[in-house]
Amino acid sequence: MKLLILCVMVHGLLAEGPGQVLWKEQVVAPEFLLDDREDIASNRNAFFYEDKRSFRPEGLGEQVKRIAGAEDVGLQPRLVTRSLQCTCETEYEYRNLGEGHYPRYLTTSHCKPKACQNKFNSCRLLYYKVHILSQRDLNGLSDDRYSDDSETETPLPEALRHKWQLKPMKIPVACVPATG
């Protein structure tokens, strides 16, 4: 069935005159090629997205069509956009561990939510273990959400051991597909 629909779409794109087309002419393309911009007005990264929205590859012009009778054919017009792969995007932020920690600032990440993510196409955080030096009289690091107190303390040289301790932490570093 999918092959038949694909053949009908290709036939419509290759048709020379309006009499050869099996459906009404409308633009069909991924959402970033269409010219409706009301859905990106609230997007804080609209200026990045704007370039994609106004991009129209050479040769698409009037040749690109949308199936107007989607109910008749059993094909949803937005199915074209669903075929684009949904990738995981990572947003980074600096985390201040406070005075008495070295390094004081770490870069952590979280997954940027996207409309195409669902239970079949979801993302998860990838964690790396890092070791942080913290002063012994400060115990704020043990309350940290990234702290990994399940492991024993890593030994330090004698000169540092009385004032500092080396604590392992699991830091989120990237957003990756959950199935993989």
UniProtKB/Swiss-Prot annotation:
Keyword hit for Signal: yes
GO biological process, one term: neuropeptide signaling pathway
Keywords annotated in UniProt: Cleavage on pair of basic residues, Disulfide bond, Hormone, Neuropeptide, Secreted, Signal
Propeptide residue range(s): 16-64
Assembly and binders: Homodimer; disulfide-linked.
Subcellular location(s) of the protein: Secreted
Domain of life: Eukaryota
Physiological role: PTTH is a brain secretory polypeptide of insects which stimulates the prothoracic glands to produce and release ecdysone, the steroid essential to insect development.
GO cellular component: extracellular region
Signal peptide: 1-15
Protein's name according to its UniProt entry: Prothoracicotropic hormone
Listed Gene3D superfamilies: Cystine-knot cytokines
Organism: Camponotus floridanus
Positions of disulphide bridges: C88-C123, C111-C175
Protein's UniProt keywords contain Calcium: no
